[in-house]
Amino acid sequence: DRMKDYCSQADEVWHAGDVGDVSILDLLPKGKMLRGVYGNIDDAAVKEILPEGLEFEVEGVKILMTHIGGKPPRYAKGVKERIKSSKAQVFVCGHSHICKVELDRELHCLYMNPGAVGQQGFHPIRTLLLFDLSEGKVTNLRVVELGKRGAIGA
């Protein structure tokens, strides 16, 4: 599947929640750093593996990740404060399953929702984001469309 090919090329795989079945995590390429959070559809098995939120730094870029985040300027409760207190340069969330990237000029933070690669949800097109992190910057950001939700062989 194309999603696995893209993940194989990446240094790290990030998942913004709604894994669904914990066995999905076993389909990800072995030996890759997985950074992820659980989503509102995830059960106890997923919650044992993934936290509700993450703060981390890669290549000088501070990242904050949670599943339910809202979007600029209407973030979910407490998210704006967490972005400020963590000094995150990138905020990654899921929940809507709709791909959206926007620079929040007020918070000086890049908002990223990769959409969804799965077949379940309201998203018409399955998407993921690829990008590079180096010297404190996000570069080479691109949206990968994996086909229509529900399409066989996509």
Language-model segments: residues:
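N-terminal active-site segment of His-dependent metallophosphoesterases
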Residues: 1-34, 42-52, 60, 124-127, ...
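Helix-adjacent hinge/juxtasegments
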Residues: 35-77, 81
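Conserved beta-sheet core of the metallophosphoesterase superfamily
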Residues: 35, 73-137, 141
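Short, solvent-exposed aromatic-acidic interface loops
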Residues: 141-153
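Short, flexible, glycine/charge-rich loop motifs used to bind or transfer phosphoryl groups or to couple energy/partner
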Residues: 1-5, 24-27, 53-54, 79-82, ...
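Short, solvent-exposed coil/turn elements at secondary-structure transition points
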Residues: 40, 69-71, 117, 134, ...
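Divalent metal-coordination and catalytic microenvironments
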Residues: 13, 18, 28, 39, ...
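Generic beta-strand structural signal
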Residues: 15, 57-58, 103, 133
